Amino acid sequence: MRRTCFETILSLQKKNKKIIFVGSDLGPGFMKHSKDKVPERFFMEGVSEQSIIGLSAGLALEGYTPFVNTIATFLTRRCFEQIVIDLCHIVIDLM
């Protein structure tokens, strides 16, 4: 399922220069292929889930469509405040 997700994002990135991938400390594996193909639109930000939400909010405000990926429990619990303040209060489109 992860492979299909990343392959789909890469396929979308090839068609749309505004699509950005933002991840948080995910293993290299098959993501290296995406990083090699579109390095300027591939960000792996380390263990900083709160930061990837803030980064993605800023990218969305500039007209990009960020796809955020990290471990689900960290995304929902560690950065709840950023999701509410950075995304929901200003109504940003984020994938």
Regions found by a protein language model. Name each.
Residues 1-95:
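Thiamine diphosphate
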